[in-house]
Amino acid sequence: RRAVAELKDKVSNVFVPLSYDPAEAVQIDWGEATVVLGGIKQKIQIWCMRECHSGDIFVSAFYRQNEESFLEGIVKGLEHFGGTPRKIIFDNARVAVKEGFGYHAKATDKYFSLSAHYAFKPVFCNPAQGHEKGLVEGLVGLVRRNFFVPVPNISTIDELNKKLLEYCAVYRNHKIPGKELTVGEMTENCKD
């Protein structure tokens, strides 16, 4: 028994690195950041999307995480990417899930309608399995560390979103370690 217990302590979970074809998937998630908005320090919600093949990003700020912001974030992100992936990967947040969880979750009526209109499949992660959408989890941290430090001092949320779009455009010049092309070059290849 002791030997089995010792072996169990040494064995760790193994995860297969995820690999995606062009335009196969986008991962989406919410984050939170602090800004000085109109002279008042406050928390805002940051909407993050990452195209899984190219690594392209879309980030937008909202006052709250609700269904309207969720759907608007998806539409704006798809416009930014210039197309629709075959699937969008998200967690089990109430704004997207009517019932169930993980692979058995059922999308809310509005999210289902949006997915039908744009012809993508909504895919939900299993609970406590952050690695299933690790690309966008990394993006939330990246944006919080790089864009929101120091704390931005802006007049309006529209001004903040304009600066976030500029940040996304500059990110397209970034080269992801292990890739031969820049994010922007890979994004263009996704559109072909």
Please place each PLM-identified region on the residue numbering.
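Two-metal-ion acidic nuclease core segments, chiefly of the RNase H-like superfamily
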Residues: 104-122
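Mobile-element integrase/transposase regions
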Residues: 2-57, 65-72
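Active-site-proximal acidic segments at structured loop/helix or strand boundaries
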Residues: 140-192
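Active-site beta-loop-alpha junctions of metal-dependent nucleic acid enzymes
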Residues: 59-87
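Secondary-structure transition/capping motifs at alpha-helix termini
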Residues: 10, 52, 77-86, 117-121, ...
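RNase H-like two-metal-ion nuclease catalytic core shared by retroviral integrases
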Residues: 90, 102, 122-144, 160
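Acidic/histidine-rich, metal-coordinating catalytic segments
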Residues: 84-103
